[in-house]
Curated annotation (Swiss-Prot):
SMART domains: AAA (SM00382). Belongs to the ABC transporter superfamily. Cysteine exporter (TC 3.A.1.129.1) family. NCBIfam families: CydC, PRK11160.1. Residues 19-308 form the ABC transmembrane type-1 domain. Keywords: Amino-acid transport, ATP-binding, Cell inner membrane, Cell membrane, Membrane, Nucleotide-binding, Translocase, Transmembrane, Transmembrane helix, Transport. In CydC the ATP-binding domain (NBD) and the transmembrane domain (TMD) are fused. It comes from Haemophilus influenzae (strain ATCC 51907 / DSM 11121 / KW20 / Rd). Residues 338-574 form the ABC transporter domain. It is found in: Cell inner membrane. InterPro entries: AAA+_ATPase, ABC1_TM_dom, ABC1_TM_sf, ABC_CydC/D, ABC_transporter-like_ATP-bd, ABC_transporter-like_CS, P-loop_NTPase, Type_1_exporter. GO terms for biological process: cell redox homeostasis; cysteine export across plasma membrane; glutathione transmembrane transport. Its EC number is 7.4.2.-. This is Glutathione/L-cysteine transport system ATP-binding/permease protein CydC.
């Protein structure tokens, strides 16, 4: 239950609507109980008066009409107010969750599937609406109304009022506790099964081509059927327990009515000529009282799911960023732009160092190629430069200041990074290119850039031009087209430092030369750092750094490295 406390604290953001909703709920339930109770007394008193006694029926009939209208009006406005307040709280919660997700580095987010993150942000947050609407508000309403009813009826007969009130308060403690325990067993399983099924279903839709190609469609369907069967079994258990709670409450209601009828028949109501009508009043009060208890069994059966959803949302909220941007230094261009001193780095939850005592100096405005075999640590160095991670040990300087001294905004403004995997948004071609810059990019610039990177045919597809819809993950595009789209974004960006991780991977030799020529031309007055294991046009770079097993083993220009006897770079060129 402690898991729910942070979400209960969110109620302060809609304090007045929630209190107003609670008051309206109390008035609505009180009107409903009063209507049935007064009606019972009114009918019995009218029957007694029908034997010849004078009876003023105007006051009780007006009370019945007033309570009936009050019940309808209160419940109408209670629904409006409580649901509006709940939506406000859920929107605030979604914003908070999203604000917690944004600072998380890719390393943290990669622990979760995209579909699972979406499920937590949408479905699990939606499940939490029951916390106020189905659990807290009805429970506190029931407590208040039972106490108010007990006080009101005590003016007529104290023993009967106390007996009825105490019986209902005992049930109010027992029924929610029992069904909370019963529902706790499968509440978490229901939430987990829902999340798993939605993830599998999304995979099934997104990977149709691959599933058909490798004849794996039936295998995934079988997994989905197993998940669906588990989910349905738990739903069936919940439905049975919900039915049992209703049957139990109805049974207890019958016992209470029978007991109240018995005790009221033997109670002393004084010598008033309508005193026997009070028997009906207490009997109908017992009947009406179970409107309070009836929804609580099924509601607290659901609390297991609410707690499980809260735990899943809390897990995201409590994630800590691997990197925190607390600096506020201004960027000033220096000749020695990037300096690494004795850098040691290993990825989280891994002991193996991918960078070992790496020392490196890179000058402003130079074109640098970083070579090395797969897994040598080339890409890891770029990850440190954009602060997706921080080094375990050592010093990394940007413009002669610690890289941690800059704010995230300053760092992102100065550095543009092309990763090995280009993300294509489910949006138009225009919007995918606009993501390259915070400033408005004209259609003419976009079209020219698409021509330069060899994506002219995209403008001709379906005759939509820049309005071409690229779909989820850019599935209509080939791997090479996705790389070129990523390059187009880089070339539309005005950052002074360009970091490119395998920019020509997946391109043929001729296209690779054209793209490298375009990149070098664009980076004429910029600092360019390219990570690659391909040697095309390598002689055009001002500096070449060779990294192996996390260490810098050679550096220099093309001519100095190619003439170095028994050098790693020279052997590499000769082998190619």
């Amino acid at each position: 239950m402690r898991t729910l406390l942070p979400f209960i604290r969110l109620f302060k953001f809609a304090k007045f609507p929630l209190i107003l909703g609670l008051v309206l709920m109390i008035l609505g339930l009180g009107s409903s109980m009063g209507l049935l109770t007064v009606s019972g007394w009114f009918l019995a008193a009218t029957a007694i008066a029908g034997l010849g006694t004078l009876f003023n029926f105007f006051y009780p009939s007006a009370s019945v009409r007033g309570l009936a209208i009050g019940r309808t009006v209160m419940r109408y406005f209670e629904k409006i107010v409580t649901h509006d307040a709940t939506f406000r709280i859920l929107s605030k919660l979604r914003v908070q969750v999203f604000e917690k997700i944004i600072p998380l580095s890719p390393a943290v987010l990669n622990r979760y599937r995209n579909s699972d993150l979406l499920n937590r942000l949408v479905s699990d947050v939606d499940t939490l609406d029951s916390l106020y609407l189905r659990l807290l508000a009805p429970f506190f309403t029931a407590v208040f109304v039972i106490i108010a009813m007990m006080i009101g009826l005590s003016f007529i007969n104290i023993p009967l009022a106390l007996g009825l009130g105490l019986f209902l308060l005992i049930l109010l403690m027992i029924i929610p506790t029992v069904f909370y325990r019963l529902g706790q067993q499968f509440g978490e399983r229901l939430i987990q099964a829902r999340a798993t099924y939605r993830t599998q279903f999304l995979e099934f839709i997104q990977a149709q081509a691959e599933l058909l190609l490798f004849n794996a469609e039936d295998k995934l369907k079988e997994k989905m059927l197993v998940t669906e069967k588990t989910w349905q079994e738990d739903q069936a258990k919940e439905a049975k327990l919900s039915g049992f709670s209703t049957a139990l409450v109805l049974f207890l209601n019958g016992l209470l009515i029978s007991g109240m009828l018995w005790f009221a028949s033997n109670a002393d109501f004084g010598t008033d000529e309508y005193h026997t009508a009070y028997i009906a009043l207490f009997t109908f009060a017992a009947l009406a009282a179970f409107e309070i208890i009836m929804p609580l069994g099924a509601a607290f059966l659901h609390i297991g799911q609410v707690i499980a959803a809260a735990e899943r949302v809390t897990e995201i909220i409590e994630q800590k960023p691997l990197v925190e941007f607390n600096g506020n230094e201004e960027f000033e261009t220096k000749v020695r732009l990037i300096s690494a001193k004795n850098l040691n780095f290993s990825y989280p939850e891994q002991e193996t160092l991918v960078l070992k005592n790496l020392t490196l100096d890179l000058e402003q405005g130079k074109k640098i190629a970083i070579l090395g075999k797969t897994g040598s640590g080339k890409s890891s160095l770029l990850q440190l430069l954009v602060r997706n991670y921080d080094a375990n040990q050592g010093e990394l300087l940007l413009a002669e200041k610690p890289i941690s001294a800059y704010s995230e905004e300053t760092l992102r403004h100065q550095i543009c990074f092309l990763t090995q995997r280009v993300h294509v948004f489910s949006d138009t071609l225009r919007q995918n290119l606009q993501f390259a810059s915070a400033d408005k990019i004209s259609d003419e610039q976009m079209i020219e850039m698409l021509h330069q990177v060899g994506l002219s045919k995209l403008l001709e597809q379906e005759g939509k031009g820049l309005n071409l819809w690229l779909g989820d993950g850019g599935r209509p595009l080939s791997g090479g087209e996705q790389r070129r789209l990523g390059l187009a974004r880089i070339l539309l960006n005005n950052a002074s430092i360009l970091l490119l991780d395998e920019p020509t991977e997946g391109l043929d030799r001729e296209t690779e030369r054209q793209i490298l020529r375009l990149i070098l031309q664009h980076a004429e007055n910029k600092t360019l750092i390219i990570v690659t294991h391909r040697l095309s046009s390598i002689e055009q770079f001002d500096k070449i750094c060779v990294i192996d097993n996390g260490r810098l083993i050679e550096e220099g220009d093309y001519n100095s490295l190619i003439t170095k006897e028994n050098g790693f770079f020279k052997r590499l060129i000769e082998r190619v």
